[in-house]
Amino acid sequence: MESSSSTFLTTTSLDKKKPSPVSRKSPKQKKKTTSTNKPIKVRYISNPMRVQTCASKFRELVQELTGQDAVDLQPEPIYSPSSDDHNLSPPAENLAPRVLHQEPFGERDSDCYEPLNAEDMFLPDQMSAGFSGFFSNGFYNVNDFGSIDSM
């Protein structure tokens, strides 16, 4: 093989038996870009509005509201406590107490809601039957161990 300034690789094609040289190019270096871009203008919207538009007008509406030609909004004043803030109160109509109209339980509801009895809730027979279902996978049986007193 001859040596030269560029690197050659030999590959064999399936159709041909002769090796063919393939040149390997050095990776391209990235060009450094100068920062000639203008700074990004960030716009915070404190009081958003709802608009309706169709799909074809959506892009135009977004450009109108946020693009270069968008009208700059007046910045809101920074919060500072003043005497006006202490006098703020919600409208009187919102202060009226709300009464929920609930009917007491009727006879038809009492069939669904029976009072709980503690004796009915914790019967040992029901509890042991319930727990044995957890252990019935064949590895061991709870009843094979016998009682605790026999150990």
UniProtKB/Swiss-Prot annotation:
A motif (VQ) lies at residues 58-67. Keywords: Chloroplast, Nucleus, Plant defense, Plastid, Transit peptide. GO terms for cellular component: chloroplast; nucleus. Disruption phenotype: No visible phenotype under normal growth conditions, but mutant plants show impaired induction of some defense-related genes triggered by pathogen infection and treatments with salicylic acid (SA) and jasmonic acid (JA). Increased susceptibility to the necrotrophic fungal pathogen B.cinerea. Residues 1-54 form a transit peptide. It comes from the Eukaryota. Residues 1-13 have a biased composition (Low complexity). Residues 1-41, 66-93 are annotated as: Disordered. Its main location: plastid. One of its GO terms (biological process) is defense response to bacterium. A motif (Bipartite nuclear localization signal) lies at residues 16-32. It is found in: Plastid, Chloroplast; Nucleus. The keyword Cell membrane does not apply. Induction: By light. Accumulates in response to infection with the bacterial pathogen Pseudomonas syringae. Induced by infection with the necrotrophic fungal pathogen B.cinerea. Expressed in leaves and roots, but not in flowers. Interacts with the sigma factor SIGA in chloroplast. Interacts with WRKY25 and WRKY33 in the nucleus. Contributes to plant defense. May regulate chloroplast metabolism upon infection with pathogens such as Pseudomonas syringae. Functions as activator of WRKY33 in plant defense against necrotrophic pathogens by stimulating the DNA-binding activity of WRKY33. This is Sigma factor binding protein 1, chloroplastic. The gene is SIB1.
